[in-house]
Amino acid sequence: MKRIICILLMLLFTFPAFAQENPFAPYEIAIPDGAVLENGEGSHTFVSGKTRVVAMLIPRVPDADIEAALQRMVFQFDPDAVMEDFLPMAEGYAAVTSRSDDQFGAGVDQLNVLILGPSGDLLILSGYDLDGNEDKVQSLLDALLENLTVNALPLVQTN
């Protein structure tokens, strides 16, 4: 059995095409049940019915005060955003939620979560629903955040 595992590991490292690269590294995002991940040219979108969450990773220089940096970045990402809450995160990480409302006369346009860690890597999750259903967007974002990890450790802290 050990021999088989060693051979498989050697093949994995010999043929990197077999190894899937994580586009969100150092963050790890599990695809929720009922959703699929569609990869476009430079973009990654989690799709569940008519609900979409676009995930973007922006490598950055680390900040000394990540919460203050996130407060600035919310409005750089979306000048019309309304910052809502900081999420309870693992030590060294911070996350803030924001929303953009009624820019097109259809209620909530998008919900955003910006996550920043000690490495400086910024993960942005920006969700919307084609029918304007805020509950479906929130549900997909919650499922993504529930399974968000770094080195197999959960980032969002629950009570």
Where are these regions (language model features)?
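Sec-dependent N-terminal signal peptides
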Residues: 4-15
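N-terminal export/targeting and maturation segments
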Residues: 21-38, 43, 47, 52-53
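Sec/Tat signal peptide C-region and signal peptidase I cleavage site
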Residues: 15-21
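Residues embedded in well-ordered secondary-structure elements
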Residues: 6, 24, 35, 102-103, ...
